[in-house]
Amino acid sequence: MKVTIFANASAKTKKVAGELHTKLLAAGFEIDDEHPDIVLSVGGDGTLLAAFHHYSHMVDQVRFVGVHTGHLGFYTDWRDYEIDQLINGLLEDNGQSVTYPLLAVDITYADTDATDHYLALNESTLKKLGSTMVADVYIQDELFERFRGDGLCVSTPTGSTAYNKSVGGAVIHPRLDALQMAEIASINNRVFRTLGSPVIVAPYETITIRPQQQSHFVFTADQMDTQPRPIEQIRYSIANRRIAFAQHRHNRFWQRVGTSFIGLDEQ
């Protein structure tokens, strides 16, 4: 089996990654950074997001494993002191995996005919800096609402516990194929109205955002952001590709939610 280690730059993580590298070689694994079968992310959820985007061009061909060097993360099944158990799990691997949906993003710009395509694991946002964003929101190409506020966030189920949750979005089990749109500081009064709550759409439905100002907007996809540009529309859909995690020991989702946000293990 060919594996690679994708680690962040912290001193603790470098030490763990070095130990993992040594033990992988001793166990007979081949280290291949170009065409791995498994990507071992060492760090936190941010490191795994970076690893996903680094290998997104071959996401159909790799599986991911997260090793956390801090507190419990949503994408990490192993702790830094469990390297030996992880190695044993890899030695017994038979290709088992759990897969989650990804977000496909297509952007059309007002100043060019080109369309940019992005893939996100967590979420994508659209914001207008310095003033209120006005945008028409379409679901399945039918006008749903005219939004006024700071911006909009569209997330995957796995991303529902990230930025989406901080702006009032719902937490969705990652095995569901769905998209969620959450409003960021929407304006609601007697003159201007939005739904004022998160919207969850079916896996075959698209969400399209069409800004109503000839202005520059900031677009993000996970950790990546773009320079402000005049955007004509952004179309969101469930991607036809999925991310796969090696299922040697996949922790229960609701247990992670309770541990991370409620502190059930401390009560």
UniProtKB/Swiss-Prot annotation:
Annotated localization: Cytoplasm
Domain of life: Bacteria
Binding-site list for NAD(+): 45-46, 122-123, 148, 150, 161-166, 185, 223
Main location: cytoplasm
Catalytic site positions: 45
CC terms in the record's Gene Ontology section: cytoplasm
An example Gene Ontology biological process: NAD metabolic process
First-level EC class: transferase
InterPro entries according to UniProt: ATP-NAD_kinase_N, ATP-NAD_kinase_PpnK-typ_C, NAD/diacylglycerol_kinase_sf, NADK
Catalytic activity: NAD(+) + ATP = ADP + NADP(+) + H(+)
Gene Ontology MF terms: ATP binding; metal ion binding; NAD binding; NAD+ kinase activity
Keywords annotated in UniProt: ATP-binding, Cytoplasm, Kinase, NAD, NADP, Nucleotide-binding, Transferase
Pfam families: NAD_kinase, NAD_kinase_C
Cofactor: a divalent metal cation
Keyword Kinase (UniProt): yes
EC number: 2.7.1.23
Family to which this protein belongs: Belongs to the NAD kinase family.
Role: Involved in the regulation of the intracellular balance of NAD and NADP, and is a key enzyme in the biosynthesis of NADP. Catalyzes specifically the phosphorylation on 2'-hydroxyl of the adenosine moiety of NAD to yield NADP.
Annotated protein name in UniProt: NAD kinase
